[in-house]
Amino acid sequence: MKFDVLCHINATGCKPSSLYTAVANQMLFSKPSKALIRCDVSLDAPYIMVEIEELAQLDRQTKCLLLLSQLLENLDIATLRKTSRISQIVFVLPQDELNNPVISDDTLSELLAEVISQQIPDFIQTTTLDLKSIAPDTLIIALDSCVSYQYVSHQAKNNVVQVLNGPPGIINGEGGCVLLTHLQGTLSAHLYNGELNEQLNQAEACVNDTYLFAGKESLAWQKKWFANTQALYSPEDELIELANLNNTIGHQGVANDPAGFVLANSYLNNPLNEGLQHVFLLFNSPNEQLIKISRSENS
């Protein structure tokens, strides 16, 4: 899959260089919530989240609408269509607790009509993105806000959420991004199959590679990662350090996978990393997935 990252919004701002600097230096934008969630049978504690300051105090739907409006404004679809073919638009957007879209298709049509004067391309709305079957010339617009008490308390029923002074868990955030898959894309993504250790073998991964983790943090995951990478080490090697996207900007919900591609772009297009040939992007939800991202030959 060849692609370009067109724009993004998260707690670090809108510039790839700011995102790279923040993640590479493990900068923290997180804060404890005012509300408490149940951690176990005997403990309530604030959860840790990363909120975009300008969106604080707003409800999830309003946040998502503002994020979408800003992405469309930054994108300039009308100009983009003059230089790039767009066969379809895929909106990766959240649903509410009743499994209804947070942003309706009618609203999406209205927003697109405001920014595109000519015929609007076909679009679909989904909550998941199948990275192995994305067609070329697809414009992917993904966003979510995952910091509300309602969202996190529901999430905590099936996941380990990071709470104040608690064990490793998911830090939630909010943001969005836009990708375009096309044959002239400046970045190329190669996905591997099988169990995590098999994927690492297929990729010929080594301890000196750059690994970007954009998944759900937990102690169980850390143990699994160490177990699967043991074979990569020789006695003198230092421990692999995962650049952790979600510890910096928070887990982006349904937009988390595309956000990982934004991070990879920020690493490969940073002047400080001119000699960096590729990075390995790593997801662990719903399954472990290793993706090698490199600069395209035609870029």
Residue spans for each PLM region:
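Conserved "HGTGT" condensation-loop signature of ketosynthase/thiolase-family condensing enzymes
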Residues: 1-299
